[in-house]
Design a protein with these regions (language model features):
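A sequence-level/structural motif corresponding to short, flexible coil/turn segments enriched
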Residues: 1-239
Length: 239
């Protein structure tokens, strides 16, 4: 098709071990990958129309849908799941906990289904965070955002199964019972959810220009490290 998804594995010396392809006749892309303790890989991104992941075929409900897929250490497709609705929906970040559950973030527009869980945007696009078990069953889905366009870009987990998300939002956005208001344009957010999908806290950073969080990582003490970009002057707490 136009663009296809690939997943590739190299050994520690940089030798190519295998490469796998997925997709269809339209535009399809992989955005993030994570590995569990058994060497299985988990991938998320988007696809349009009909896309094949090994013997599994998915068909999007609208312009583009989210996919979450699992491969074993030899590159065999184990399962592939889709989420989304009739508009544009993208998976941007994925992380795995010690039990093999996958956590995914990105954005959706309009009404989107994550297995049995349906979410409706508050505005142009909303952030989603969703959890699947090791067999690809949807466990929960949460949304955040407001009346404008809001995006989740990266997600990480700690040893207790909490997940941490970063991205950006504009104007007022709700993260559960927590409301944030951007300084003027887009601001960075960092949020923590527990293993059941409850929002524990959300923080913002930025200034009056465009600011965004693009990647997040967690250390063994539960500290989160975030990177992205800012323009002009930006505040990060008291710094």
């Amino acid at each position: 098709g136009q663009d296809d998804i690939f997943v590739a594995k190299l050994d520690s010396s940089g030798n190519w071990l295998w490469t796998k392809q997925a997709g269809g006749t339209n535009y399809d892309g992989g955005y993030s990958i994570a590995i569990d303790s058994y060497g299985n890989s988990y991938v998320t991104g988007y696809f349009r129309g009909t896309a094949s992941f090994g013997s599994t075929t998915l068909t999007s409900s609208g312009e583009s849908d989210i996919f979450v897929a699992k491969l074993d250490s030899s590159g065999n497709w184990l399962w592939a799941k889709k989420a989304g609705g009739t508009d544009y929906d993208y998976g941007y970040g994925i992380a795995i906990d010690s039990s093999g559950n996958s956590y995914v973030t990105g954005y959706f527009q309009g009404i989107a289904s994550f297995g049995p869980y349906y979410k409706t945007t508050s505005g142009g696009s909303d952030i989603f965070v969703t959890k699947l078990d090791g067999d690809g069953n949807w466990l929960w889905a949460k949304k955040a955002g407001g009346a404008y366009y809001d995006y989740g870009y990266s997600i990480a987990t700690d040893s207790s199964g909490n997940c941490y998300v970063t991205g950006y939002f504009k104007e007022t956005a709700s993260f559960g019972d927590i409301n944030l208001t951007s300084s003027e344009s887009y601001d960075i957010f960092v949020a923590k959810l527990d293993s059941s999908g409850n929002w524990l806290w959300t923080k913002q950073a930025g200034g009056t220009n465009y600011d965004g969080g693009y990647s997040i990582a967690i250390d063994s003490y539960g500290n989160s490290y975030v990177t992205g970009y800012f323009r002009g002057t930006a505040s990060f707490g008291s710094t």
